[in-house]
């Protein structure tokens, strides 16, 4: 009997995968340790956050998330692995394919650089892993990206400077956002 595991089941990509395929097990950051040592036949790891602006705002915290992802994968010890990554690991994705090497990383933002580091660690630990580099996404359940921002009037997060500017002009803005642990102001209820 085949056993497959989805990590990142509550995120955009993971949630869509879960909606289309019945995995033997699915988990996310709060319950991933229950999967340690299970050695599934296949692990689809979609558990890396895709909030580019947060990664670039705090590169070290984002790299710590990549280290934790590597450790999670090692502890799960799957026989086969699919890592969901990002095309942002390429400085210039024009004409590139998923297996295109990331040659020039100079000037690459932390988001891409840190995901590239995770890809390299995965290659060290699981040489036969399939790494899928997704482009900008759009669809049901998306909570961020350029296209989402175009049709969503109220932003889910504000930088501190923008919050201060808007809150000074509007009591509604002042009461609608709360300072989050990541230093951004988050829209209440999101």
Q: Whereabouts are the PLM-identified features?
A:
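Active-site beta-alpha turn of Rossmann-fold NAD(P)-dependent dehydrogenases/reductases
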Residues: 47, 82-86, 133-135
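Conserved glycine-rich Rossmann-like NAD(P)H-binding loop of the short-chain dehydrogenase/reductase
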Residues: 22-33, 38
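NAD(P)H-binding glycine-rich loop region in Rossmannoid oxidoreductase-like domains
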Residues: 33-78, 87-96
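Active-site Tyr-X1-5-Lys
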Residues: 106-130, 135
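NAD(P)-dependent short-chain dehydrogenase/reductase
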Residues: 124-190
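Short, well-ordered alpha-helices that flank and scaffold nucleotide-derived cofactor binding pockets
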Residues: 19-23, 71-74, 120-124, 152
